[in-house]
Amino acid sequence: DGNRGQANYAASKAGIIGLTKSVAKELGSRGICCNAIAPGLIETDMTGGMTDNEEVLAHIPLARPGKPEEVAMLAAFLAESDYITGEVIRIDGGMTL
């Protein structure tokens, strides 16, 4: 989903999705998996004051921002998996439901 004034950001996200699926198909026969992680609102220096904004949190069913450690745990899980490939996995507390 695009937002006004963010065409470049939306295009880059679409590019990552296409690249992920293409690489998964091209390298799967060699046993190489390729996936993408699509984080939602995660507590970082970049997200600053957004993580305690009630209006923003109201759009997240789990009613809180994610933690960097949670994204890292997903990355570690995918690194261990030998049978997940070509997937874009959202970690956003249900924000995109």
Sequence positions of predicted segments:
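Conserved SDR Rossmann-fold cofactor-binding beta-strand/turn motif
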Residues: 33-39, 43, 90-92
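C-terminal substrate-recognition "lid" of short-chain dehydrogenase/reductases
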Residues: 67-91, 96
